Amino acid sequence: MADNKPYKSYFLDPLWNNNQPLIAILGICSALAVTTTVKTAITMGLAVSFVTGCSSFFVSLLRKITPDSVRMITQLIIISLFVIVIDQFLKAFFFNISKTLSVFVGLIITNCIVMGRAESLARNVPPIPAFLDGLASGLGYGWVLVFVSIIREFFGFGTLLGLQLIPKCFYASEAHPDGYENFGLMVLAPSAFFLLGIMIWVVNILRSKKAKR
């Protein structure tokens, strides 16, 4: 892999052109659990960015002294180290969010994006480009989660970041039975897959139109 690629490209490409959930269709399973609210989506996006960036950096740093026979085991050990760090950090300083995310922080180690960037790029390039790519891959994953969570939280709960945006007086009550009701489907896990599917469809249309120009 060419090492003379500009650092800017390593950071910008994963945000859109090589966005892992939208282009490579990786890391979408966690969208079921962590996109019901914007807070959890932001937290998971930042956690994955930290783990992917740091693990890619150290995989690259150790690439020349890591025997090929234990390459993937070494990568998993590095990834699990940073997953433990972020998990303990959230439990220490953001306990409520950590409790909401439950086991899904620990399951970052199974996220295909983290291992994918380590295996496909980090072991082939110097540490700085590897870190930029890993960080941006996590951020690219994160903004997709946040976009989905904004729609789900607003229509499912009438809130954003826990703030009530739809006035309580608009909701149905005994006095006004025909008032507004939250869109219950958005609270259910399958809605995340529907929204991701629509996003992937729109992105493919935009990419195909751009390719024809």
UniProtKB/Swiss-Prot annotation:
Similarity comment: Belongs to the NqrDE/RnfAE family.
Taxonomic path: Bacteria, Pseudomonadati, Chlamydiota, Chlamydiia, Chlamydiales
Primary location recorded for the protein, binned into one broad class: membrane
Gene name of the record: nqrD
Residues annotated as transmembrane: 21-41, 42-62, 77-97, 101-121, 131-151, 183-203
Record flagged with keyword Magnesium: no
Membrane topology term: Multi-pass membrane protein
Subunit structure and binding partners: Composed of six subunits; NqrA, NqrB, NqrC, NqrD, NqrE and NqrF.
Protein name per its UniProtKB record: Na(+)-translocating NADH-quinone reductase subunit D
Species name: Chlamydia felis (strain Fe/C-56) (Chlamydophila felis)
Broadest EC class assigned to this enzyme: translocase
Acetylation is among the record's keywords: no
Biological process terms in GO annotation: sodium ion transport
